[in-house]
Amino acid sequence: MTRPVRTRFAPSPTGFIHLGNIRSALYPWAFARKMKGTFVLRIEDTDVERSSQEAVDAILDGMQWLGLDFDEGPIYQMQRMDRYREVIAQMLEKGLAYPCYMSAEELDALRERQREAGLKPRYDGTWRPEPGKVLPEPPAGVKPVLRFRNPLTGTVVWDDAVKGRVEISNEELDDLVIARPDGTPIYNFCVVVDDMDMGITHVIRGDDHVNNTPRQINILNALGGEPPVYAHLPTVLNEQGEKMSKRHGAMSVMAYRDAGFLPEAVVNYLARLGWSHGDAEIFSREQFVEWFDLEHLGKSPAQYDHSKLSWLNAHYIKEADNARLAELAKPFLAALGIDDAAIATGPALEAVVGLMKDRATTVKEIAEGATMFYRVPAPEADALAQHVTDVVRPALADLVAALKAADWTKEAVSAALKATLGTHKLKMPQLAMPVRLLVAGTTHTPSIDAVLVLFGRDVVVSRIEAALA
């Protein structure tokens, strides 16, 4: 194929978009970028009753968050109705399509008879014009559907980039309805016209569309178009081994952002969910684009693993710039009651984030850990009784004296802690736990010396002294 590469993502805006859906955007986006081609966003909104602007916004927001920029679009099918009707008129004129007056009840009865006879249920061509054939008289007042004249013989063949060579006999296909009685064109027809008009060269989509492909190829051939390269991606399964879907508990793409995942982690994870480059597990967006090809798309269903995504996210959090993480943490802090005014009263948020990120798997966890720096501690009475004992109080008093005199560095604070331990014959947990509790309000913190340095000398000394008073 010598045409410039043009790929597309063509979602239906009928619900939220999950990771399995957005993978069908990631791969054509990457292929277009790799081949210096064009990536088109098409919104297939012909299902008027189920489509919504809210769902469109979710698609756009998810793509923007993940950095899947498109070169053309969004193109809405509902805004192309005149073009579809124009093509239908041409097909009727050329005998490529015909009106069919068979009612839904008649079609159901036909299919039932076929099933009882052990045949594949299908339309039998009652209204299909043929030389010498006498058609029934059109029933009065009935608006027909329009059907495509599918070839009766021959085979539809395509070399799928994932599935290999696929051959479907035309005898297996009936005459597809391409327009409803009200004249509204249906999905399988609109897709063909769109792909032809938009010059799509590669269709990378889920394998739930495989059954549509031979019908679409036949229509495309009838219209004189050039079929694209097809790559049908195996299903994404959830952790229970079911097809990923909202009904089976899938999260929306934006729910991952709201849970504190970084977009680069999600992109990296999605890239590996059905494609591989050797043993590479962690790679940048730029590396992904450079390495991506259709030859290494997986042929088996890929199963979502939340722990693997969390592991990747933890890696990217550790690598992320502290200033960026601080900005990302602010909405989570706000949800926990820590606003900008509260942040201004405590240590620099960038420094806090830098301390917390090595222990976190999400930005939300960073924010949860950071709250101790911006709240007055309120340790539970049971915890105080357990850790701030009469044995420890003299050591706490000596530690305060040492901290007042020490340089306020991590090394100096660490030395003061160790000296106090030596003097009072204590082990680190015996001293660190009560100090954490009194200063931070919790016994769960990163390294105690680093935490104390961030709180600042005045806060540390005053909080321990208040407990000893």
UniProtKB/Swiss-Prot annotation:
Keywords: Aminoacyl-tRNA synthetase, ATP-binding, Cytoplasm, Ligase, Nucleotide-binding, Protein biosynthesis. It is found in: Cytoplasm. It catalyses: tRNA(Glu) + L-glutamate + ATP = L-glutamyl-tRNA(Glu) + AMP + diphosphate. GO terms for biological process: glutamyl-tRNA aminoacylation. GO terms for molecular function: ATP binding; glutamate-tRNA ligase activity; tRNA binding; zinc ion binding. ATP binds at K246. A motif ('HIGH' region) lies at residues 11-21. Its main location: cytoplasm. PROSITE patterns: AA_TRNA_LIGASE_I (PS00178). One of its GO terms (cellular component) is cytosol. InterPro entries: aa-tRNA-synth_I_cd-bd, aa-tRNA-synth_I_codon-bd_sub2, aa-tRNA-synth_I_CS, aa_tRNA-synth_I_cd-bd_sf, Glu-tRNA-ligase_bac/mito, Glu-tRNA-synth_I_codon-bd_sub1, Glu/Gln-tRNA-synth, Glu/Gln-tRNA-synth_Ib_cat-dom. A motif ('KMSKS' region) lies at residues 243-247. Its EC number is 6.1.1.17. Monomer. Catalyzes the attachment of glutamate to tRNA(Glu) in a two-step reaction: glutamate is first activated by ATP to form Glu-AMP and then transferred to the acceptor end of tRNA(Glu). HAMAP family: Glu_tRNA_synth_type1 (MF_00022). Belongs to the class-I aminoacyl-tRNA synthetase family. Glutamate--tRNA ligase type 1 subfamily. This is Glutamate--tRNA ligase. It comes from Burkholderia lata (strain ATCC 17760 / DSM 23089 / LMG 22485 / NCIMB 9086 / R18194 / 383). The lineage of its organism: Bacteria, Pseudomonadati, Pseudomonadota, Betaproteobacteria, Burkholderiales.
